[in-house]
């Protein structure tokens, strides 16, 4: 069969490879001039920067794409586990290193508050049990009809997840110490959600980091995108770049997706898998006579969106890789207040930031004697933060100054401005324009209870035959391992349909 995949982000690349490995003819259409989507790369002034995701969690999910296509993952990506997850700075003189080794972890916890290990381990145990339930009964399956969700098994297993509790509540149930609470709460920002609003299940991220480890891919995270692109080429997939999709064509008589309009041409296919940002697809790519019924264009703006981010890619003329960790988190003095600012549409004068220094793990990513630094500051998306003008250069200069002051929390970056030889910024406007991300959201639809599982955009269209969706705004959600799972479960359904002649 001839299959079209819209989008060459990590979801599209993984899905296309899985389909092609089953013997089908696959073409990927990508609007930009490179693969990767939000897993993007910037090469500038001799530096190589990952532009999007940077932390490799759940490596088995990465490996599975290659293995299930009959290939050895080591021929495509080089993974290695980190001994330490990150350095966390509460202020200039208060930094802790978070290890993966349990003995070291216990020592770290006891140094913060004697006796805290028991509550921490109880938290990890509770969350691990919830994760296993969620993975088996909710995350790794699709919902094609109401009875797939509304059944006794889902009711019983869902009750065990205690989804009405928020991430903050679960953390505070086990942890009294404010510093340790912060260590467990900030990761919800990895998927763009407020820990006060996110279901307690989303506190799984620190559990995954500590129980499964954090890894690094040689060449940076973009090495995964390159590995997937090579996998697709080896499987005979055709990747068309600079191919802007104008419309998904729906046959009005048979109510099926049978073609796409790309760069002015109509291209026929047997099935279409769309991995572009779902809200933008529902709003702009469906014909007027054939909207996605649950998500017509006029309702898209009313959905809840994850936060966005202001990113900086900085090159400095000194090598500091032996004085800083690969991954670093610098907390705002008022951590809770900063989160409120993000989700209430305000910019912060004292933000929490994430700092990634890839040359710590791979010297080839910066010129000799120099260092590349990636900084992410969570911000409101464009709907909540409608009063923020990201095109205002004076404003972005102010934000850069705020970030440089915050970076000075790490001693080696105290005089960073005098060493800058390269600087690039990426704003919520860029998320919207570059990736067609609705409202510049960095992580797609916010995974609130009302926008999760059965209530999230589904992988198999309920309105039109031969149309499928995958990616961060669809089930099961955002984050690289999760969108790889989205690709897997969607392709599994497509292959099942092909085998059954549906």
UniProtKB/Swiss-Prot annotation:
Q: Which GO molecular function terms does the record list?
A: 4,4'-diapophytoene desaturase (4,4'-diaponeurosporene-forming)
Per the record's keyword annotation, is Oxidoreductase included, yes or no? Answer: yes
Q: According to its UniProt record, which protein family does this protein belong to? A: Belongs to the carotenoid/retinoid oxidoreductase family. CrtN subfamily.
What's in the keyword line of the UniProt record?
Answer: Carotenoid biosynthesis, FAD, Flavoprotein, Oxidoreductase, Virulence
**UniProt-recorded name of the protein:** 4,4'-diapophytoene desaturase (4,4'-diaponeurosporene-forming)
Recorded catalytic reaction(s): these are: 15-cis-4,4'-diapophytoene + 3 FAD + 3 H(+) = all-trans-4,4'-diaponeurosporene + 3 FADH2
Its GO biological process annotations read: carotenoid biosynthetic process
Q: Which organism is it from?
A: Staphylococcus aureus (strain MRSA252)
Membrane-spanning intervals of the chain: none
Name the gene for this chain. crtN
The organism's superkingdom is given as: Bacteria
Which NCBIfam families has this protein been placed in? Answer: crtI_fam
Pfam families, per this entry? Amino_oxidase
What role does this protein play? Answer: Involved in the biosynthesis of the yellow-orange carotenoid staphyloxanthin, which plays a role in the virulence via its protective function against oxidative stress. Catalyzes three successive dehydrogenation reactions that lead to the introduction of three double bonds into 4,4'-diapophytoene (dehydrosqualene), with 4,4'-diapophytofluene and 4,4'-diapo-zeta-carotene as intermediates, and 4,4'-diaponeurosporene (the major deep-yellow pigment in staphylococci strains) as the end product.
| Keyword Oxidoreductase belongs to the record | yes
Q: What is its EC number?
A: 1.3.8.-
Pathway it belongs to? Answer: Carotenoid biosynthesis; staphyloxanthin biosynthesis; staphyloxanthin from farnesyl diphosphate: step 2/5
Query: How far does the signal peptide extend, from start to end residue?
Result: none
Q: Spell out the InterPro entries in the cross-references.
A: Amino_oxidase, Carotenoid/retinoid_OxRdtase, FAD/NAD-bd_sf
**What residues bind FAD, as annotated?**
5-17
Q: What class of enzyme is it?
A: oxidoreductase
Q: Which residues form a coiled coil?
A: none
